[in-house]
Amino acid sequence: MTVRKTLLSLALFTSLVAQTACSGDLVLEKRLNPADTLRETTNRTVVPGTFVMTVKSVNVFNKMVFLNSEDSYLDRANVAVQITSAVAYNADIRFGGDFRKMVLNRKILVIGSAMKVGADLEQGIIVNNKDDYRTYIFVSRASNIFLR
């Protein structure tokens, strides 16, 4: 479990460094929808980019906010944008209201890094088998979130 957490931390750090290099105003040319994101992350690589999706559900767990592309986070087709509660708070200020309610059933564009993450009970995800992975897009700043 320690190796998994170390690899996840390293991948998250790499994605944060990649995001820091991007301005909040920069929108990369290639925009990935949830199906593209699932396909691009099959090799368990970190995929930085611009992602477009409609938020169908919002979950909060361990001070993290998950914006889901599917009604259930257990759906294997789900791609979740993961942001910290601090980023969600900054998004509340930026968009002038309760960000979690504002994005529900709306199309969003985010700049971040996507990767497959092994599902485990510590993350609050029910494990179906040992090859169970979920796809997350890590976004580190509210300025990297755009409503459409």
Where are these predicted regions, by residue range?
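Bacterial N-terminal signal peptides that target proteins for export
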Residues: 1-8
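Hydrophobic helical h-region of N-terminal Sec-dependent signal peptides
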Residues: 8, 12-16
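C-terminal motif of bacterial Sec signal peptides marking the signal peptidase cleavage site
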Residues: 20-21
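OB-fold single-stranded nucleic acid-binding module
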Residues: 24-148
